Amino acid sequence: MVSVIIPNYCHAPYLRQRIDSVLAQSYPDFEVVLLDDCSTDGSREVIERYRNHPRIKQIVYNDRNGGSAFAQWRKGFALTQGEYIWIAESDDYADPAFLERCMAELDADPACVLAHTLSRTVDSEGRPFGKVRHAGRPVRRMDGRRFVLRHLLRRNE
């Protein structure tokens, strides 16, 4: 099972599209946790429309703002039970086959533990703008150690 965490803070204009795009996924085995970090823009009203949806495992409203997206992620991790976690940011949306394609790659190689994808920037009408770097690249496997050393660790010189 995949646990989908949707952390939200004041993204009411995009939130319905995000939640709908998650719930429309063709992959059959997932749960959704909706987290709201004290939004003041009507996000709660959008979220409440989904309260009784069978895929929604839990909805959590913070009493005060956590101050960090990472705090929301940690809260979501504690509430989920899936083998994999998808952090589906509230101002994005996904193609209906997104999760199915990611899981096919992860399932094809038991050594894979992380899927990373490219994204496309769109305007408020859904029209793409800007470039998608490396669009059309084939799926590839990376050695995690080399990735960490090259991209995440920096020497303090």
Language-model regions, residue ranges each:
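Nucleotide-sugar donor-binding/catalytic module of glycosyltransferases
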Residues: 1-157
